[in-house]
Amino acid sequence: RLADEGLIETLARNEWARNRISIELLESIFLDDSDPVYDKHIGKLRELGVDIAIDDFGTGHASIIGLLKLNPYRLKIDRQLIAPIADSPSQRGLIKSIIDIGKSQKIQVCAEGVETREHLEVLRDFGCECLQGFYFDRPMAAHDLVDYIAKEKWRSNS
């Protein structure tokens, strides 16, 4: 879909989309084998105020050069890398390094798969800005989200 001119044209026609949309690209299909058409469209998306995020980081074979070239707004560390941090010092070191790389490039880093209090504490200690996972709650319907926020239920797990 990223190569689809219709996507760019539709977003350009809709003012509401500016600065409200984030497109997540899978690390495994984009970073190392980027196409000039993709590069052009990503530039146009940025001009329209669309944030670019890399999803499932750590599961593909991306290079640091690919990361620098794309310069995403957000880098989402895959849950497979987060799961073992409670028991593995080497895994914690790897996650800390990824977070530090993101920070050095002014990229927001988001950890997916936060499922325990220990995950939360380790990632907070590392300065991870965005945490996502079942520790906070399960997915829910939009109409349930309004009540959840109003009653501040989310505060009990943070």
Regions found by a protein language model. Give the residues of each.
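EAL-family c-di-GMP phosphodiesterase catalytic domain
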Residues: R1, R20-D33, V50-S158
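Acidic (Asp/Glu)-rich catalytic clusters
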Residues: G6-R20, I42, L68-N71, R124
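Serine/threonine-rich low-complexity intrinsically disordered regions
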Residues: D4-G6, N14, D35, A150
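Alpha-helical scaffolding segments of alpha/beta enzyme cores, especially the outer helices
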Residues: G6-E9, V37-E47, K96-D100, V122
